[in-house]
Amino acid sequence: MSGHSKWATIKHAKGAADAKRGQLFTKFIKEISIAAKMGGGDPATNPRLRTAVLKARAANMPKDNIERAIKKGTGELGAVNYEELLYEGYGPGGVAVLVEVLTDNKNRTAASVRNIFTKSGGNLGATGSVAYMFNRKGVIEYDAEVVSEEAIMEAALEAGAEDIATEDGVITVTTDPNDFASVLEALQEKGFESVSAAVSMVPDTYVALDADTTQKALKMIDKLEEDDDVQTVSSNIEIPEGFEMPE
């Protein structure tokens, strides 16, 4: 659930991160496998694989799982036949939504994604309908209660980050997507543990909604993220100040 709110406001979606850890690992396995298939099994010479592995490590995915995913991608543990697709559309309140998927059955995935949009009061759009509103960025987030903003800022800028901002108790480090892996690795080596790390589609501007519409939009995003074929969901929703998702 990237590109629309800080970690502190999206814990309702993953927050339950432990309960959803298996599902999250499944998504990482797909991402690592397809990266290894396309560029080889060595993270040192395959930037996409290196990024995927770093993201998995940041989420505490076991090393054995990562190694098996790489071998699956290189064909050592069977063939990988995932297709990468991008769905674009609008959610409640006119929020722009991008859905990135890895699927072995695009008809199944298209039907599922369309159904979620429709039942949630949104609509799936044509290719290019909302993607122009976003830019791909590396986004690394830290809990401001756990790490020092000053220390993160110094280390991140030294590592080549584009921007560092703190809001609602979350320190957000933004990078060029090509620098994401090296910046994350540099911060990990200095002992900074992120709460989330991903190359995400970040919107140019955000759309403010009332609390009721925000709740509906976030519920739609939750449902999309729960689909096993969906890797990431990005939107331009701006969370109202003081908003809390009902349990």
Curated annotation (Swiss-Prot):
It holds the Pfam family TACO1_YebC_N. Its main location: cytoplasm. Keywords: Cytoplasm, DNA-binding, Transcription, Transcription regulation. GO terms for biological process: regulation of DNA-templated transcription. It is found in: Cytoplasm. Disulfide bonds: none annotated. SUPFAM superfamilies: YebC-like (SSF75625). GO terms for cellular component: cytosol. GO terms for molecular function: DNA binding. The keyword Transcription applies. InterPro entries: Integrase-like_N, TACO1_YebC-like_2nd/3rd_dom, TACO1_YebC_N, Transcrip_reg_TACO1-like, Transcrip_reg_TACO1-like_dom3, YebC-like. The keyword Transcription applies. Belongs to the TACO1 family. HAMAP family: Transcrip_reg_TACO1. This is Probable transcriptional regulatory protein TDE_1487. It comes from Treponema denticola (strain ATCC 35405 / DSM 14222 / CIP 103919 / JCM 8153 / KCTC 15104). The lineage of its organism: Bacteria, Pseudomonadati, Spirochaetota, Spirochaetia, Spirochaetales.
